[in-house]
């Protein structure tokens, strides 16, 4: 079941970023060193009441850093744009207002917009860091958006109440029956790299509106086909375009659409334009796929438009591999969606990666493997004088494959040894196209006897 997307909207300086950082601070610290992601995240995942959801800093996504010194008219316009995009893209909305400032005209204007949607809206009155402020929150009943919830993002007061209300709106958890599970493939990439053309080629018909104007594919489109007797769902998305002027904020907001598609897929086909080469946006999207731990195929499209000699393919492949060296397990396929060149290979790769993601190594075999690789290269502890020992390993999860290694002290494991184990696992068992997760856990002392 896809994670709900929650957008935080409100005027500048009401505390949206403070609340956002409080929600995803730990998560952000974990992923900030992944290639293709940045330290200042605009979105992230968090948990509450047993539910995981994606929270989005809507203002930052649309406009970058907020400037409270902007003219009041411009602040109001930007806040309205946030609300409109949240209504269009999010599953639920947190509307944040400032309890110190009290009710403003801009707040009322946004409330008018939010009341037009059937999507749930939680009214959070921030900066209520005293009993008096909390009592003043009743003023916001006038917005007619339900009970205002007093809170302080800075101190953490009342944030749990906001999240309690939010998760009440989430649909009940559902679990697919085994027979309903089948391969889902997302076609992702920047605008005008040929995503819809590829979808049409795979379908053999015009399913999406295709135009040289970037962004003509507006919303994710799901189509299920049958390939060698097996159903495959293809998800086409609006592309991600480089940051531009405020008026083009809607293009930056397409990040949410790609996030949603990646979250729902098993394998992502990331299209790169051969005529432009690999861009920073391409590697950023690859980082999103890594973070979601989904399978990945690097697809170089428009290969027919490249003038070639005997070395062109090898030189271009080397450049692509260098740019995406942080996903060296992903296959590279050169295609032309226009002519159909090698397009048929893509579904074969996707099916194989899907199978690799479901692969499970028997515990006995995995521990034979562990003994072998430890003998070949014993682990070195990160602390001088300390001795690191790896006892045994299990694979508790698939999709993606997760391997849990028990050690005398997990803090002694150097990152390079985790990389060594991953490389050896791939050499022995494949796992082409899918990330694998290596986890170390300290064994209890009483177990060491």
UniProtKB/Swiss-Prot annotation:
Residues 359-444 form the KH-like domain. The keyword GTP-binding applies. InterPro entries: AAA+_ATPase (IPR003593), G_ENGA (IPR031166), GTP-bd (IPR006073), GTPase_Der (IPR016484), KH_dom-like (IPR032859), KH_dom-like_a/b (IPR015946), P-loop_NTPase (IPR027417), Small_GTP-bd (IPR005225). Keywords: GTP-binding, Nucleotide-binding, Repeat, Ribosome biogenesis. Signal peptide: none annotated. One of its GO terms (biological process) is ribosome biogenesis. The keyword GTP-binding applies. GO terms for molecular function: ATP hydrolysis activity; GTP binding; ribosome binding. GTP 2 binds at residues 189-196, 236-240, 301-304. Residues 4-174, 183-358 form the EngA-type G domain. SMART domains: AAA (SM00382). GTP 1 binds at residues 10-17, 57-61, 126-129. PROSITE patterns: G_ENGA. Associates with the 50S ribosomal subunit. GTPase that plays an essential role in the late steps of ribosome biogenesis. Belongs to the TRAFAC class TrmE-Era-EngA-EngB-Septin-like GTPase superfamily. EngA (Der) GTPase family. HAMAP family: GTPase_Der. This is GTPase Der. The lineage of its organism: Bacteria, Bacillati, Chloroflexota, Chloroflexia, Chloroflexales.
């Amino acid at each position: 079941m896809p994670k709900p997307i929650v957008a935080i909207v409100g005027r500048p300086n009401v505390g949206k970023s403070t609340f956002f950082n409080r929600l995803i601070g730990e998560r952000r610290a974990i992923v900030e060193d992944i290639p293709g992601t940045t330290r200042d995240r605009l979105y992230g995942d968090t948990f509450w009441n047993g539910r995981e959801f994606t929270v989005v800093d809507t203002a930052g996504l649309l406009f970058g850093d907020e400037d409270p010194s902007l003219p009041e008219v411009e602040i109001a316009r930007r806040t309205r744009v946030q609300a409109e995009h949240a209504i269009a893209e999010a599953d639920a909305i947190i509307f944040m207002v400032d309890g110190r400032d009290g009710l403003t005209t801009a707040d009322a204007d946004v409330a008018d917009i939010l009341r037009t949607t059937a999507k749930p809206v939680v009214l959070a009155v921030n900066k209520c860091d005293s009993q008096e402020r909390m009592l003043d929150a009743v003023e916001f009943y006038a917005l007619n958006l339900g009970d205002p919830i007093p809170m302080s993002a800075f101190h953490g007061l009342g944030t749990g109440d906001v999240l309690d209300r939010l998760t009440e709106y989430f649909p009940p958890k559902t679990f697919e029956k085994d027979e309903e599970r089948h391969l889902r493939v997302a076609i992702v990439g920047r605008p005008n790299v040929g995503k819809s053309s590829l979808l049409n080629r795979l379908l053999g018909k015009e399913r999406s509106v295709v135009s040289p104007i970037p962004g003509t594919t507006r919303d994710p489109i799901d189509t299920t086909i049958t390939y060698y007797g097996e159903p495959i769902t293809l998800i086409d998305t609006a592309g991600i375009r480089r940051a531009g002027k405020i008026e083009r904020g809607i293009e930056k907001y397409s990040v949410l659409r790609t996030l949603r598609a990646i979250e729902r897929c098993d394998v992502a086909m990331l299209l790169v334009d051969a005529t432009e080469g690999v861009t920073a946006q391409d590697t950023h999207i690859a980082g999103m796929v890594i973070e979601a731990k989904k399978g990945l195929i690097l697809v170089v499209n428009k290969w027919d438009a490249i003038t070639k000699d005997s070395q062109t393919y090898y030189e271009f492949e080397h450049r692509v591999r260098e740019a995406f060296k942080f996903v060296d397990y992903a296959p590279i396929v050169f295609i032309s969606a226009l002519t159909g060149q090698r397009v048929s290979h893509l579904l074969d790769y996707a099916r194989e990666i899907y199978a690799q993601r479901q692969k499970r190594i028997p515990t006995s075999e995995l521990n034979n493997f562990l003994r072998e690789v430890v003998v070949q290269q014993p682990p070195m502890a990160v602390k001088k004088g300390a001795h690191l020992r790896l006892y045994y390993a299990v694979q508790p999860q698939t999709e993606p494959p997760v391997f849990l290694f028990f050690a005398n002290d997990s803090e002694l494991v150097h990152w390079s040894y985790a990389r060594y184990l991953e490389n050896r696992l791939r050499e022995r068992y494949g796992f082409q196209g899918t990330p694998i997760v290596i986890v170390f856990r300290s064994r209890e002392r009483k177990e060491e006897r």
